[in-house]
Amino acid sequence: MTDLHSLLIAFILGVVEGLTEFLPVSSTGHMIIVGHWLGFVDEKAKTFEVIIQLGSILAVVVMFWRRLFGLIGIHFGKVPHEGKTSGRLKLTHILLAMIPAVVLGLIFHDVIKSLFYPQNVMYSLVIGGFLLLAAEWFKPKEPRAVGLDDITHRQAFMIGCFQCLALWPGFSRSGATISGGMLMGVSRYAASEFSFILAVPMMMGATVLDLYKSWHFLSLADVPMFAVGFVTAFVVALIAIKTFLKIIKRISFIPFAIYRFIVAGVVYMVFM
C-alpha cells in the first residue's frame, strides 16, 4: 500500500466518519461497509477508526463547549434557568444516561466486537430504521420537554436505555438516543442536542478503552494517515452537526429511515 493510497483511504474514511457519526444512519455501519469495500479491515483499520472518532468528538466539544462546561458548574454568559434548583441540564442527567450502555458495554465488549461484519450491519440498519419511523409515528403530539433544560432525570435514564441498542454495530447511537428521547416526550431538536452532548463522554470512554486494547498496533509510520483521518473527520463532523440541527427543524426522520433501508438493500446485494 503506497503512502498516497493510505492518505486517500484516510481521507475517504474521515469523510464517512464525520458525515455519519451524528446522523441517525450509523457511522459504524458505514465504516464497516466502506472499509470492506476499500479492503481496509485489518487490526490497524480498527485502531484507525478509533483514532478518527476522536476528531468527531472534538467537533461536538467545539459546538457545545458552553454546555459541557456548564455541566461541571462553569458558566460563560447567562446561566439557563438561573436561580432555580431544577429545570436545568445537569451532570446527573448525563451520568444517568450513561449507566445502562456502560454496564452492558463492559460486560459484552468482546461479543460486540465480534459483530463487526456487513451482514450484522444490514439487520441493524433495518431495525434501526423502523425505530426512527416508530419515533415519528408514536411520539406525543406535544413534547413534554421542548428544550434541553426541560429534560427530566427519568427521561435521561430512558434515553440511556435506548442507547444500549447502539451496542449492536450498525444501529446508530444517535438514532437510538434521539428516537428514545422523542418516544419519551422530548422534542426532536432537544433530543438531538442531548444525544450530541451525551456522545462526548460515551465515545471518549469507548475510545480510551479501545485504544488501551489496541495501542500496540500503533506506529510512527501511521501518524500521517491517522492525522489526515482525524482532521478530516473533525471538519466534516462540525459541518454535519451544524447542518443537521438546522434541517431537523423542518423535516422528520422518515427520510433517514428510508436511507437506512436503501443502504441495507445495497449491503444485501453486495455482501450476501
UniProtKB/Swiss-Prot annotation:
One GO process term, biological-process aspect: regulation of cell shape
More info: Bacitracin is thought to be involved in the inhibition of peptidoglycan synthesis by sequestering undecaprenyl diphosphate, thereby reducing the pool of lipid carrier available.
Protein name: Undecaprenyl-diphosphatase
Organism domain of life: Bacteria
Chemical reaction(s) catalysed: di-trans,octa-cis-undecaprenyl diphosphate + H2O = di-trans,octa-cis-undecaprenyl phosphate + phosphate + H(+)
Source organism (scientific name): Pectobacterium atrosepticum (strain SCRI 1043 / ATCC BAA-672)
Membrane association type: Multi-pass membrane protein
Keywords noted in UniProt: Antibiotic resistance, Cell inner membrane, Cell membrane, Cell shape, Cell wall biogenesis/degradation, Hydrolase, Membrane, Peptidoglycan synthesis, Transmembrane, Transmembrane helix
Assigned EC number: 3.6.1.27
Top-level EC class: hydrolase
Record-linked PANTHER family: UNDECAPRENYL-DIPHOSPHATASE (PTHR30622:SF3)
One cellular component (GO) term of this entry: plasma membrane
Described function: Catalyzes the dephosphorylation of undecaprenyl diphosphate (UPP). Confers resistance to bacitracin.
Pfam families tied to this protein: BacA (PF02673)
Similarity annotation: Belongs to the UppP family.
Compartment(s) where it occurs, according to its Swiss-Prot or TrEMBL record: Cell inner membrane
GO MF: undecaprenyl-diphosphatase activity
Residues spanning the membrane: 6-26, 45-65, 92-112, 115-135, 189-209, 221-241, 251-271
